[in-house]
């Protein structure tokens, strides 16, 4: 069976998945829609999943590269935020399916409140100074994947090149998937552990997980880490993105007391 068929989801199954998350159902129950609707390929997908984690997550001090940036949340005594459960897999979730991206014409643009608008081709983008970040990954649908190493370019480097103006307080990230956007407070976008990533655990990020380049903002829920990113705009005022317009939290901090900042009414 073609693995792209296994990992593909539909807006219907995504909606069910998120609805179950609202009502605090356990992690295994939240996965039932995918078990039912994965085109009868769910077990095959488990067996061939190259990202399955057999071992316990490493501790930050076990990372052998001294140049790797350590996300501060990995130093917590309990690395699982409120209402979350650990998964050893790397589930695939998206709003519109995986877009077909022509790498020859791929570009990344920076505009808005900047001194110098920027546009890079993929080759140019991957020549930017690289960083490595060790971080955990928390999905609003109540699963957390610990122990990830991302490679790419720091968001701080992008901001420095573009010359972000002082009045910029928010970032609107846009993706190649049918006009998808998400908003991020600039202080989170510019955290030391935030980056525009092209690799995960030493391998190129596969298309179903947001490759060739995706945003990673480890200190917010993962819907803020836009897949298939094509640009960022620096703004003075906050502007709701795709999920935020539907009621998701404008910030999305998983560590807020209670149940995290999942929805605007939470």
Name every feature range the model reports, one short phrase each.
Residues 1-10:
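Extreme N-terminal basic, low-complexity initiation segments
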Residues 9, 33-34, 54:
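Intrinsic disorder/low-complexity segments enriched in polar/small residues
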Residues 15-37:
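Arg/Gly-rich low-complexity intrinsically disordered repeat tracts
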Residues 41-266:
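Structured, non-membrane catalytic/scaffold regions adjacent to prosthetic-group chemistry
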